[in-house]
């Protein structure tokens, strides 16, 4: 008999971060359904704001303006209502985005190795930063891993994503959210315990002096 996994109660934005091909969109859509939250795709929001595809935004305006637009969109989204938000690839590298995420969101890094990323991204034409032949794509992925993984490591939760069914990854994410909130609650109780003890001691001392 398969037991149904209890869903955590989430009252803030869940921000999925990671490199292109880490599964932010596919995992995010299913996670949002499980948690009864809306799903927002950062890349699609960038395309909507620009009125162009990601490839055309990069082609017409260059990487600097592409990143600036990405940062503006993420700033708006991170000030919004609770949802599951798949970040634009690379957006978490921006300091402003990371700061806002730490204030307003629970950040989850979908961490994948280079072989998984390559398998999921090779030959895809919608990813403007990963265009080229197979060797070029692999070299670019390795470069992004080296440059960006230190930023992603600042996320609240890290979930390793492998070449497995999306539903399995979603279960890992939900279990990690449960664990994160349980740990945070235990820490909060420990921090409050000394205050309660001191309060009890003060009350006892006060009663003793009145006798």
Task: Say what each PLM segment does.
Residues 2-9, 34, 146-211:
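NTP-dependent small-molecule kinase module
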Residues 19:
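P-loop (Walker A) phosphate-binding loop of NTP-binding proteins
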Residues 25:
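Walker A/P-loop
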Residues 103-149:
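A glycine- and Lys/Arg-enriched "phosphate-lid" helix/loop adjacent to the NTP-binding pocket
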Residues 41-91, 95-102, 126-127:
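ATP-dependent small-molecule kinase phosphotransfer cores
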Residues 22:
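ATP-binding Walker
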Residues 16:
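Hydrophobic anchor at the beta1->P-loop junction of P-loop NTPases
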């Amino acid at each position: 008999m398969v037991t149904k996994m209890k869903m955590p109660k989430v009252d803030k934005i869940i921000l999925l971060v990671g490199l292109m091909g880490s599964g932010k969109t596919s995992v995010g859509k299913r996670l949002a359904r499980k948690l009864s939250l809306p799903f927002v795709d950062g890349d699609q929001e960038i395309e909507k704001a620009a009125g162009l595809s990601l490839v055309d935004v990069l082609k017409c305006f260059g990487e600097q303006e592409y990143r600036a637009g990405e940062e503006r969109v993420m700033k708006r989204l991170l000030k919004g209502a609770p949802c599951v938000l798949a970040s634009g690839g690379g957006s978490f590298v921006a300091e402003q985005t990371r700061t806002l995420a730490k204030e307003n969101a629970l950040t989850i890094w979908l961490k994948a190795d280079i072989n998984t990323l390559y398998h999921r991204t090779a030959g895809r034409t919608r990813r403007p930063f990963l265009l080229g032949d197979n060797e070029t794509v692999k070299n670019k992925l390795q470069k992004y891993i080296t440059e960006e993984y230190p930023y992603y490591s600042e996320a609240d939760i890290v979930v390793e994503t492998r070449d497995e069914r999306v539903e399995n990854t979603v279960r890992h994410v939900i279990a990690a959210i449960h664990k994160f909130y349980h740990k945070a609650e235990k820490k909060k109780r420990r921090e409050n315990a000394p205050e309660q003890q001191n309060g009890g001691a003060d009350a006892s001392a006060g009663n003793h002096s009145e006798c």
